[in-house]
């Protein structure tokens, strides 16, 4: 197997750096429900292909991709007027030596030389610093400002990459998460991409995020949260309703 190790941080259930090692043959992930088996596979797939749930990850960045505890810590710091850095998703794939020599370097979280691999991040983009500072001063932030985030890929040699040019590929078969795009979806996405300026898209995303925040804080929805959680006998964690964050 080309991948020897995966390190995941702040992606879904994995807050602190979580490491999984693989052998060259068949690898089986065994664990209880909600232990993160599917999340590990999703992390590998998105880091290699840029696809999540059947769609380009750049088109569906969402706070739900982030570890909830990390997001809550960030929001608490903003509320206390001592904001910490917005959380960042990091996925690193360590390749077997000799797989992709041009991907070799120390651009990894371990700062180790002579290692081949790819580093995928969903992180706050510094180009939005002024807009973010303005948001902190003028608005009450109750959710992650995902409109200021970008998804990027880098080889361990620190060269930025496009996922379609990463030679190693993965196939993830999970029909439960696959979402098909109809003709109108494709047309609207093309219009947004081709005709709107970046500041227009940011404004739309902020308005959409505010709408979702209002939905989550609605008293009727809060009451339904409590009923759902009380009725649930399948999962240990809390169940809740949420509005779709795709724009």
Predicted regions and their residues:
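Short flexible coil/turn linkers enriched for glycine and charged/polar residues
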Residues: 14, 85, 233-235
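Residues in well-ordered beta-strands of folded domains
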Residues: 21, 92-94, 121, 152-154, ...
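Non-catalytic alpha-helical coupling and interface elements of nucleotide-dependent molecular machines
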Residues: 45-53, 125, 156, 193, ...
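Nucleotide-state sensing region of NTPase/ATPase domains
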Residues: 67-156, 160-162
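A conserved P-loop NTPase coupling/switch region
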Residues: 136-197
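Extended helical coiled-coil dimerization/tether regions that scaffold
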Residues: 187-247
């Amino acid at each position: 197997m080309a991948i020897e190790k995966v390190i995941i941080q702040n992606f879904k259930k994995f807050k602190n750096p979580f490491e999984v090692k693989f052998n060259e043959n068949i690898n089986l992930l065994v664990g209880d429900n909600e232990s993160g088996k599917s999340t590990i596979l999703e992390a590998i797939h998105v880091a290699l292909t840029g696809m999540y749930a059947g769609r380009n990850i750049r088109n569906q960045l969402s706070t739900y991709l982030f570890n909830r505890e990390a997001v809550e810590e960030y929001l608490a710091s903003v509320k206390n007027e001592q904001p910490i850095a917005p959380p960042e998703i990091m996925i690193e794939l360590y390749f077997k030596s000799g797989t992709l020599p041009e991907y070799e370097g120390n651009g990894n979280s371990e700062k180790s030389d002579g290692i081949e691999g790819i580093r995928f991040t969903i992180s706050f983009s510094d180009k939005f610093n002024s807009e973010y500072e303005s948001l902190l001063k003028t608005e009450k932030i109750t959710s992650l400002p995902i409109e200021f985030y970008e998804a990027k890929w880098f080889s361990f040699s620190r060269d930025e990459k496009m996922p379609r040019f990463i030679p190693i590929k993965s196939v993830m078969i999970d029909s439960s998460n696959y979402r098909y795009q109809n003709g109108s979806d494709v047309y609207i996405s093309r219009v947004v991409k081709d005709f709107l300026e970046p500041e227009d898209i940011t404004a739309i995303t902020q308005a959409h995020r505010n709408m979702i925040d209002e939905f989550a804080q609605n008293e009727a929805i809060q009451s339904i949260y409590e009923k759902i959680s009380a009725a649930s006998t399948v999962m240990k964690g809390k169940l809740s309703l949420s509005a779709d964050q795709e724009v």
